[in-house]
Amino acid sequence: RIHSLNSMGHNWWTSCVCQGGILALSLQNELPEVKEWVEQLHESLPEWFDFAGDVLQQKAKSFDEAGGMYESLNYANFGIQEALLFRIAWINTHPGQNPGDIPQLAKLPSYFSQVCYPRTGMLHSLNFGDSHKNVSAESSMMLLYALGMKDPTILWYISQVEQGQHRDGYFLNRPMGFLYTPDLSKAPAVPQLPTSQLFA
């Protein structure tokens, strides 16, 4: 019951709240009162990235200092993807306005790349529980790139993911992949990343 009242820090928070935000953005011309809801969400979104945990509810801090997320790649990608979809929609409906800074976004390309397992064939990822090794984070990487983060590591990562390698991907034969796949011709052969990384 407590989780249903307070899911801050969990990937479902951004899923539920940000999809509601996109719905509100689509209705703001017909229902002026939803503009206030949109702005409340926009102002609250950084709190999800900043969530420091909750000792009483035994909830971990969402992101560590190196940018790692405790829910591993699959669930981190899901929560981040939902947040970035709302952020892009907010920017598109608020031309010229400053969307504000979310410092954790800058560390995500490194995190997603450090928890993948490059190999011959499709990219594998380090996950836990009910996640599959084929799940990747190209959707969040594409949205980060679309938001102006032109990190070559993003291009490398996306170029390693095979088309159709998992069910939730942003692939070229799907609308989001068609719209947001960047030009991968300049993807580096190897990303400029440390050879090891600790997330804690």
Residue ranges and their predicted role:
Residues 74-200:
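Carbohydrate-active enzyme catalytic cores, enriched for enzymes
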Residues 1-110, 116-117:
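Aromatic-lined, polymer-binding surfaces characteristic
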